């Protein structure tokens, strides 16, 4: 059997994932013993003694063989026995979960996979079922596909089946090594997706993004401002302190507004290390759209890419002239 890795986002993958449904085998019904009415019919009518000495000389009547009994009597007795047999209640068929429940499970599996990958632990399918899916095992294919799509769009990762025999999975980085080195944030890959999501929102807004708008987007990923997360911990502290201290974000109060509101801007380090075209590619991957779906932002990204290319050519020109001399 080939152990070639397979992407879960591939629609052909569904045919290769083992069936997640568990088939329960019902007990085979056993034969029904003949009821008392059948024994009475087989015994026949009692024989009355004849004469004064008949009681002593009478012998018991010969037993009637079952082959000599009218088949209608047997059928009637069997139906009577089935009528008195207690019937086991039918097992209710579970209703399929709502799409929102499958999405929630997909988010739970996404964070589970990210944590396992950070700890350099093997991703086994049975562990996913036991620790995350639980009673949703019948819908494991749908949950795996949704999880793979979220990982690819948000974090630039692919969830691949690396060994079909042992059902071992692995996370494969979809971004190029140069892009990963530029925004890896000390090799904490989940942080990359979190940062790119916020920077993308700021870029689409044009100048800055209010804190409320940022949290509306992060809630889609299951992140809450005042709730500890299994992967990130204190998410609010990360985006308002860590990213700010690393100069990836600016976090400023909006003037002349009560109660106080805050907004995010690109930091100096983000402007140096992350290009607008990379943000456009990230948005296209997340929303499954062409970058030209944001025409003004796409033109701006093209202009920046052209300017960077010209600057690189200008920087290389003196070196080439010196080498020729």
Curated annotation (Swiss-Prot):
Pfam families: MAGE (PF01454). This is Necdin. GO terms for cellular component: cell projection; centrosome; cytoplasm; cytosol; nuclear matrix; nucleoplasm; nucleus; protein-containing complex. The keyword Hydrolase does not apply. One of its GO terms (molecular function) is DNA binding. PANTHER family: MELANOMA-ASSOCIATED ANTIGEN MAGE ANTIGEN, NECDIN. Residues 102-301 form the MAGE domain. GO terms for biological process: axon extension; axonal fasciculation; axonogenesis; central nervous system development; genomic imprinting; glial cell migration; multicellular organismal-level homeostasis; negative regulation of transcription by RNA polymerase II. Brain specific. Not detected in other tissues. Expressed in postmitotic neurons. In adult brain the highest expression is in hypothalamus. Highly expressed in thalamus and midbrain. Relatively low levels are in cerebral cortex, hippocampus, striatum, olfactory bulb, cerebellum, pons and spinal cord. Also detected in neurally differentiated embryonal carcinoma cells. Growth suppressor that facilitates the entry of the cell into cell cycle arrest. Functionally similar to the retinoblastoma protein it binds to and represses the activity of cell-cycle-promoting proteins such as SV40 large T antigen, adenovirus E1A, and the transcription factor E2F. Necdin also interacts with p53 and works in an additive manner to inhibit cell growth. Also functions as a transcription factor and directly binds to specific guanosine-rich DNA sequences. Residues 1-69, 77-96 are annotated as: Disordered. Binds to the transactivation domains of E2F1 and p53. Binds also SV40 large T antigen and adenovirus E1A. Interacts with nucleobindin 1 and 2. It is found in: Cytoplasm; Nucleus, Nucleoplasm; Nucleus matrix. Keywords: Cytoplasm, DNA-binding, Growth regulation, Nucleus, Transcription, Transcription regulation.
